[in-house]
Structures are given as C-alpha cells and as structure tokens.
Swiss-Prot record:
Keywords: Allosteric enzyme, Carbohydrate metabolism, Hydrolase
Phylogenetic lineage: Bacteria, Pseudomonadati, Pseudomonadota, Gammaproteobacteria, Vibrionales
Gene giving rise to this polypeptide: nagB
Function as written in the Swiss-Prot or TrEMBL entry: Catalyzes the reversible isomerization-deamination of glucosamine 6-phosphate (GlcN6P) to form fructose 6-phosphate (Fru6P) and ammonium ion.
UniProt keyword Nucleotide-binding, yes or no: no
Enzyme Commission (EC) number: 3.5.99.6
Organism whose genome encodes this protein: Vibrio vulnificus (strain YJ016)
Protein name per Swiss-Prot or TrEMBL: Glucosamine-6-phosphate deaminase
GO cellular component: cytoplasm
Pfam families xref list: Glucosamine_iso (PF01182)
Length: 266
C-alpha cells in the first residue's frame, strides 16, 4: 500500500487528478482498447473532478476513450433528482469533459429487479476485462462505496441498507433532513473493488482520521471495509494532514520520506 500524505484537501484533489491523467495518458486508450475508470460521488472527490476538468481544458488529458463505472446509486429517487448520483456526476464532471455518453456506466436505482441490475453491472465490468483504476472515498466509519461495517470483504454488487450514521452524514445534501435520505442503495462490493488493477482512495478531514488509522495501521477487518485495501497489490491512499491525526508519527514520517519525490510540486 502507498500513502501520499499532503497538507490540504485541495492538494489531495490535484494529486489525484494528476495521477489519473498520467494513468490515462500512459495507457494511450483507443476506441477498441479504452481505459476503464471507476468513480465515486460525495464531497471528497469534488476537488479531484475540478482539477481533472482543468487538465482537460488545458489539453493535458482526454476522456474520449475512457469508460467509467460509478460506485453506487441510491434506491428510490428519480435519476434526475438533484441528489441522485447520476445528477451529481453529470453536474460535477461529465458535462464538462469530452467523455462519450455510451461510455458512462451508472447503476439504476429504480430498476424493477435490483438483483438483475446488479448482475448486469458486474457483467458489464467483466466485458472490459477489469477496471484499470478505481478512485473512491471513505466514510467516517471506514466504509467504501456503500459497503457498511460488517460487509463481506468478498462481496459483489448488490443492494445494501444504509446505516443511520451514513444517512445522517448524507443528510447535508438533503437540506439536513435525514427523512429525505434514501434507506437503500445499490453498490459495488468490496470484492468488485478489489478486482480492479489499481485502487486510489481519497481521505480528507479530521473526521476520517479513525478510518485512515484502521486502513493503514489496523488489521484487515470487515468492520472497517477500507482495511481490505491491505489485500490489494496496487492500492494508494491520498490524504490531507487533518486525516492523519490518529496515525503514529513514525507512520506518517515513513511514508512522507518514501513518497518525497512524488509529493514535490503539490
């Protein structure tokens, strides 16, 4: 596992965007051989999406031959609801880059058969081989996507019940009213995520400090699904200073020295 310790959340966004752009450019994608990118929603990746849009506008990266898969979607709200993850992705990213509509893959939270929809999504991912790079965030309780505490670390895409903590955290997007926050979501599984060639998780803010500690210094534990990153051969966590407050000083020092040349300029 790599840990990229930066000072601010803005730096996390810029580092992550530069990393994604480099991966895409090094891959040299074509229509027949697209780069497959996994994407999250929420507050944490907004800085990354903003930085990626800037890189696109500067001509430093193209998404024409990039295929995307999103992590999750709420069940029971319309696709055009302002807080659906479809709306989030188009408003904050897709509408501002050159991605082709047919290359955008999103879970349908209003599908009549949720199990069939989840299997369709898994099959679609497999049709591309695997996801080249999956970017994600992490919840205060260490959940990745909507794989809440005690989720199976070999789980696949499925419907999940959201914990009250998650609904409270997400109520900030619903006028602070938890009753407006859906109780269920479709989400990729931890196993789905681990199938990716590379995983990059963004961690910002002091409220994520315990989750970061569990991911880096804790044992692999289904109560902290982010800890499953320890099982992956190519995972990277990009974090800001406030999120590292629960880590041992020597841990932060170790990774700061190890990644020194990769942090320069950010």
């Amino acid at each position: 596992m790599r840990l990229i310790p930066l000072k601010t959340a803005a730096q996390v966004g810029k580092w992550a965007a530069a990393h994604i752009a480099k991966r895409i450019n090094d891959f040299q994608p074509t229509a027949e051989r697209p780069f497959v990118l996994g994407l999250p929603t929420g507050g944490t990746p907004l800085a990354t999406y903003k930085a990626l849009i800037e890189l696109y506008q500067e001509g430093k990266v193209s998404f024409k031959h990039v295929v995307t898969f999103n992590m999750d979607e709420y069940v029971g709200i319309s696709a055009d609801h302002p807080e659906s993850y479809r709306s989030f992705m188009y408003n904050n990213f897709f509408n501002h880059i050159d991605i082709q509509e047919e290359n955008i893959n999103l879970l349908n939270g209003n599908a009549e058969d949720h199990e069939a929809e989840c299997q369709r999504y898994e099959d679609k991912i497999k049709s591309y081989g695997r996801i080249n790079l999956f970017m994600g965030g992490v919840g205060n309780d260490g959940h990745i996507a909507f794989n809440e505490p005690a989720s199976s670390l070999s789980s696949r895409t499925r419907i999940k019940t959201l914990t009250e903590d998650t609904r409270i955290a997400n109520s900030r997007f619903f006028d602070g009213d938890i009753n407006q926050v859906p109780k269920y979501a479709l989400t990729i599984g931890v196993g789905t995520l681990l199938d990716s060639q590379e995983i990059m998780i963004l961690v910002t803010g002091h409220n994520k400090a315990l989750a970061l500690e569990a991911a880096v210094e804790g044992s692999v534990n289904h109560l902290w699904t982010v800890s499953a990153l320890q099982l992956h051969p190519k995972s990277v966590i990009v974090c800001d200073e406030p999120s590292t407050q629960e880590l041992k000083v020597k841990t932060v020092k170790y990774f700061t020295e190890l990644e020194a040349k990769n942090i320069v300029g950010f």
